[in-house]
């Protein structure tokens, strides 16, 4: 179904995985060597609240920032259902060249690995300026899982509105609101994804988002600094203060709507 234009839009959406595949082939472990000293200084200057999150390189608190069944120990059936949902949300055209199982041993995302992958993708032009959508979110998860063996439990961003900061310390890609004119929306060069999946209607705040690389996120945990309430009890805030801040931002009301919808 659909005309010629819809096929063009669909094909452009499927190019993301291909672009990420083309970015492979180099090792970026050397990036950590230049960051290690500065990172240590940043950690020493951090407050107790940030230290309590255990953001040191090579450390990871399982379930800390997850939105998958692994957050709370689940049955194997629940995990399989989650993986199947991810696969169902990604078209078969997106899976061209995608291996059935990870090419390397499965591993969790770490601070160092997030830094390396961020620079790796940036230097190959894989995400800069690309419109964000839930579908592309899953494509990125799928790519890193199949090509790098990284369990897809780490990619979360602050709720908005405005700039959405990564909640996993070390991931250097944030989401920024962009203005898209009516003319640009009709221009074929802007059809990186079907409009139904990139329009402001997909975002609860009515914003169109795009990925943007920010190297300062390697030293400044903006998600925690700007929105500690989104980390719940790990923020060091009282339960009442967390509730107050979430209510002031309209996040609790939004969560209630999702439950009733």
Swiss-Prot record:
Membrane-protein topology: Lipid-anchor
Localization (cell): Host cell membrane
GO MF terms held by the record: GTP binding
Lipidation (N-myristoyl glycine): 2
InterPro entries: HIV-1_Nef_core_sf (IPR027481), HIV_Nef (IPR001558)
Any one GO CC term of the record: host cell plasma membrane
Membrane-crossing segments per the record: none
Keyword tags: Host cell membrane, Host membrane, Host-virus interaction, Lipoprotein, Membrane, Myristate, Viral immunoevasion, Virulence
Region (Mediates dimerization): 138-154
Chain positions covered by the region annotation Acidic: 88-94
Pfam families, per database record: F-protein
Family label: Belongs to the lentivirus primate group Nef protein family.
Record text about domains: The N-terminal domain is composed of the N-myristoyl glycine and of a cluster of positively charged amino acids. It is required for inner plasma membrane targeting of Nef.
Function of the protein: Seems to play a role in optimizing the host cell environment for viral replication without causing cell death by apoptosis. Enhances virus infectivity and pathogenicity. Probably involved in viral immune evasion mechanisms.
Quaternary organization: Homodimer. Interacts with host CD247/TCRZ; this interaction induces down-regulation of cell surface TCR/CD3 complexes.
Protein name listed in UniProt: Protein Nef
Gene that this polypeptide is encoded by: nef
């Amino acid at each position: 179904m659909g005309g010629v234009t819809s096929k063009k839009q669909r094909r452009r959406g499927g190019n993301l995985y291909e672009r990420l595949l083309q970015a492979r082939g180099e090792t970026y472990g050397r990036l950590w060597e230049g960051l290690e000293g500065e990172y240590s200084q940043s950690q020493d200057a951090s407050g107790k609240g940030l230290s309590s999150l255990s953001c040191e390189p090579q450390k990871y608190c399982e379930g800390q920032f997850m939105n998958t069944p692994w957050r709370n120990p689940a049955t194997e059936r629940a995990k399989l259902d989650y993986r199947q949902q991810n696969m169902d949300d990604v078209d078969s055209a997106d899976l061209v060249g995608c291996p059935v199982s990870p090419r390397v041993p499965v591993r969790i995302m770490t601070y160092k690995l997030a830094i390396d992958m961020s620079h790796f993708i940036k230097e190959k032009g894989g995400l800069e300026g690309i419109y964000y959508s839930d579908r592309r979110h899953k494509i990125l998860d799928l790519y890193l899982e199949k090509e790098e063996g990284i369990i897809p439990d780490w990619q979360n961003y602050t709720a908005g509105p405005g700039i959405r900061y990564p909640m996993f310390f070390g991931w250097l890609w944030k989401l920024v609101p962009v203005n898209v004119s009516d003319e640009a929306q009709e221009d074929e060069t802007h059809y990186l994804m079907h409009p139904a999946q990139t329009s402001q209607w997909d975002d609860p705040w009515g914003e169109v988002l795009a990925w943007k690389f920010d190297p300062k996120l390697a030293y400044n945990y903006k998600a925690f600094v700007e929105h500690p309430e989104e980390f719940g009890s790990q923020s060091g805030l009282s339960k009442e203060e967390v509730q107050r801040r979430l209510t002031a931002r309209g996040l609790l009301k939004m969560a209630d709507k999702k439950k009733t919808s």
